[in-house]
């Protein structure tokens, strides 16, 4: 069978496809975003720490230009002076270097996240084939990268050139100033120029981030056949099947709990079961079950019912029969019509009592539940 072309891959990648690509180290990256953040951090460090940096660099420059006649006869003094100058330069530039390195390590995480994959480091002999390399040279991706580089270089060059032309007199005055003052003013000029460059490239960086995400998703597009194959593969995975069933049960239980406030009555076996019933004589031919559960779920049904003032009736045989023989969203069995009718009659009496007051209606007893629908062992357990 011939391989599918890119034209056939019109579907967005599935979460499984994205996760698999991530495990293989295929995530969107924007070098422009990293460059922008590095430049921005450098500008901030120079802007806020420029005075201290200027003093240290000026002191280092002054010490470097100072000539000690003893160095002529003692080469060790020259070596010691060089080491001192290197240490001074490192201490002066340490905040700038540390900030830039830290941002260079962290910035890729902002777009694609932190991931370590050894697969991208494995040798691929297919890369030795020159034909795919030549094809990549003339691809749309390469053309877009070239256009982006030309635009960025042009923009940075124009901003820098305009800035130098506008501040040329100030730069010329630096030669007449003391070393410390000149160094501080020079750093201010450099910082302002870098800030203007940052502001100029922000729109381009935003476009690059969007372009990288779009290209990444386009590269991972799938055909309809790919999606069907992935689904079949996932369906055969017991872990995935179990996860799907678990999610389906959780969703069904969540929907069921949302329907409890709509119930007219909750029939309970206090130690085991709860069944919520609803009946609308204008829309339903028979009462239906909107929620049911055992154990903790039964307790939660009763709690939600109490929060919404849904009447609760303790009727263990009826609760057991409804739990065993009625399904959620379905009408109750015909054999239980008589018992449920007595329960609903009590509910209507209870509603009238709440509105008009008077004597509270007694709960129905000895409801007619067929023995075939009850379970004698549970009946004995309840006492």
From Swiss-Prot:
UniProt KW keywords: Bacterial flagellum biogenesis, Bacterial flagellum protein export, Cell inner membrane, Cell membrane, Membrane, Protein transport, Transmembrane, Transmembrane helix, Transport
Identification of the protein by name: Flagellar biosynthetic protein FlhB
Location in or out of the cell: Cell inner membrane
One GO CC term, this protein: plasma membrane
Species for this entry: Salmonella typhimurium (strain LT2 / SGSC1412 / ATCC 700720)
UniProt-annotated stretches for the region Disordered: 1-26, 359-383
Transmembrane segments: 33-53, 75-95, 96-116, 146-166, 191-211
Any one GO biological process: bacterial-type flagellum assembly
SUPFAM superfamilies to which the protein is assigned, alphabetical: EscU C-terminal domain-like (SSF160544)
UniProt topological domain (Periplasmic) ranges: 1-32, 167-190
Cytoplasmic face of the membrane: 54-74, 117-145, 212-383
Comp. bias intervals (Basic and acidic residues): 10-26
Pfam family, one: Bac_export_2
Similarity annotation: Belongs to the type III secretion exporter family.
InterPro entries: FlhB, T3SS_substrate_exporter, T3SS_substrate_exporter_C
Function: Required for formation of the rod structure in the basal body of the flagellar apparatus. Together with FliI and FliH, may constitute the export apparatus of flagellin.
Membrane topology: Multi-pass membrane protein
Primary localization class, coarse: membrane
């Amino acid at each position: 069978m011939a391989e599918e072309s890119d034209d056939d891959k019109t579907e967005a990648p599935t979460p499984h496809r994205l996760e698999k690509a991530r495990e293989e180290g295929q995530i969107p990256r924007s070098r422009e975003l990293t460059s922008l953040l590095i430049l921005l951090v450098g500008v901030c460090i120079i802007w806020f720490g420029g005075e201290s940096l200027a003093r240290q660099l000026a002191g280092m420059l002054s010490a470097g230009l100072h000539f000690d006649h003893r160095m002529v006869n003692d080469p060790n003094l020259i070596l010691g002076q060089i080491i001192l100058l290197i240490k001074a330069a490192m201490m002066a530039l340490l905040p700038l270097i540390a900030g830039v390195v830290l941002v260079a390590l962290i910035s890729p995480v902002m777009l694609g996240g932190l991931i370590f994959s050894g697969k991208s480091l494995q040798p691929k002999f297919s890369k030795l084939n020159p034909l795919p390399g030549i094809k990549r040279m003339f691809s749309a991706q390469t053309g877009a990268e070239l256009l982006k580089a030309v635009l960025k270089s042009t923009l940075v060059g124009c901003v820098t050139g305009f800035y130098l032309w506008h501040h040329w007199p100030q730069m010329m005055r630096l030669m007449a100033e003391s070393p410390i003052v000149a160094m501080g003013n020079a750093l201010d000029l450099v910082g302002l120029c870098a800030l203007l460059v940052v502001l100029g490239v922000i729109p381009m960086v935003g476009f690059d981030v969007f372009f990288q995400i779009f290209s990444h998703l386009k590269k991972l597009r799938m055909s309809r056949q790919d999606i069907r194959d992935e689904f079949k593969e996932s369906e055969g995975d017991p872990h995935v099947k179990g996860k799907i069933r678990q999610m389906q049960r959780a969703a069904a239980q969540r929907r069921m709990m949302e329907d409890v406030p709509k119930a007219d009555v909750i029939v309970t076996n206090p130690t085991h079961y709860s069944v919520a019933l609803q009946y609308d004589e204008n829309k339903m031919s028979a009462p239906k079950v909107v929620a049911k559960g055992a154990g903790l779920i039964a307790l939660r049904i009763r709690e939600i019912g109490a929060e919404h003032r849904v009447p609760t009736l303790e009727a263990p045989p009826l609760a057991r029969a409804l739990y065993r023989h009625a399904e959620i969203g379905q009408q109750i069995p015909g054999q239980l019509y008589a018992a449920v009718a007595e329960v609903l009659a009590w509910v209507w009496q209870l509603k009238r009592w709440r509105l008009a007051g008077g004597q509270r209606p007694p709960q129905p007893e000895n409801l007619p539940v067929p023995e075939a629908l009850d379970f004698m062992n549970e009946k004995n357990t309840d006492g």
